[in-house]
A protein has these predicted regions:
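Bacterial Sec signal peptide processing site at the extreme N-terminus
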Residues: 27-49
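Loop/turn-rich, solvent-exposed surfaces of beta-rich toroidal or solenoidal domains
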Residues: 294-313
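Sec-dependent bacterial lipoprotein signal peptides
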Residues: 1-27
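Extracytoplasmic beta-rich repeat domains
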Residues: 31-35, 55-81, 105-123, 145-162, ...
């Protein structure tokens, strides 16, 4: 009896070659435009969407206008603060004002000393900082001084206000908690500063009994509000340049906390997203920005240091 042995490898190759030739010859006789692998009711994902007409014109009415030519805002830290129906503004020359946001009528206006940071408002108080390191709290109703506390350092960013505390971040990298009613220092934390930093600072953010703050060393820190105990921290980016100038990784923008995530950005670094539950970074994209990320309708946007805009879905 004779046995026949088939070369399996060669047999499979011949079958594959035959199938390829058959398919090519079959396709050449077909109308490729009519060849579809989806039903008529389904959407072809590769087909460009049709352009739709839309109107970009909106009618905006000017209810009221107030001009202020006092002081400068080079660092962009003199921004208005809203609370109830009032708008609070301050400038570097020391003018602090309370304005009715509906009518534009000035409720009260006072002259303070030269200021280094703008207004923060909440829980009945209004807080500013002057060039001598004094943190000053005013009564929101009439502008009367409630207390003044010297923190022995320049404060360049508006404070964060809670029912019990006023949280300050100084230009020297120190995070301070002052009693909201008396201005007494309750606790402090000092971060490690690099040798070279950008003049500017980010404001702390208070969410659910925790403080979120970005530092000049390019790190995000999370602290317990009542005690100042560090809960966790993470690097927004790492210094990697060959010189101190190219290694600047200052984070001069406030973190944004939303949906269990913390969105952060820094200069010559990253747009970085941290997960609150995991206490770690879960997504990064190379970026260089002085501004806080913007999250709106499922879109993440960041304004770059060169004024370009990046968006992510």
């Amino acid at each position: 009896m004779k046995y026949f042995q088939i070369n399996t490898y060669k047999f499979k190759n011949n079958i594959s070659l035959f199938l390829i030739i058959f398919l090519i010859s079959s396709c050449s006789s077909m109308d490729m435009d009519s060849l579809k692998f989806w039903e008529d009711g389904e959407v072809d994902l590769e087909e460009p969407k049709k352009l739709e007409n839309f109107s970009s014109n909106y009618a905006i009415s000017n209810n009221w206008k107030i001009s202020s030519n006092n002081g400068e805002n080079i660092l962009g830290n003199f921004i208005p603060s809203f609370n109830a129906n009032n708008l609070f503004i301050a400038d570097s020359s020391g003018v602090v004002s309370s304005i009715n946001s509906l009518s534009g009528q000035i409720n009260w206006e006072i002259q303070s000393t030269f200021l280094s940071s703008g207004v923060a408002s909440g829980f009945g108080v209004l807080v500013v900082s002057d060039v001598d390191g004094n943190v000053i709290a005013y009564n929101q109703d009439d502008g009367s001084v409630l207390w003044s506390s010297n923190v022995k350092a320049e404060v360049l960013a508006p404070a964060a206000i809670d029912a019990k505390f006023v949280i300050i971040k100084t230009g020297s990298g120190e995070l301070l908690a002052l009693d909201k009613n008396s201005g007494e220092l309750k606790w402090s934390y000092r971060s490690k500063l690099p040798n070279l930093t950008i003049r500017g600072s980010s404001s702390p953010v208070i969410v659910d009994g925790q403080i979120f703050v970005s530092f000049d060393n390019g790190r995000l820190g999370v602290f317990e509000l009542d005690s100042g105990f560090p809960i966790w921290d993470g690097a927004i980016s790492y210094a990697s340049g060959p010189s101190e100038l190219e290694s600047l990784v200052d984070s001069d923008s406030s973190p944004v906390v939303e949906g269990g995530l913390v969105y952060t950005a820094n200069y010559q670094g990253n747009l970085n997203i941290f997960d609150l539950a995991q206490k770690r970074s879960v997504w990064t994209s190379e970026s260089s920005s002085f501004f806080s990320p913007i999250i709106i309708k499922g879109v993440l946007a960041i304004i770059e240091a060169d004024s370009s805009i990046k968006t992510f879905s």
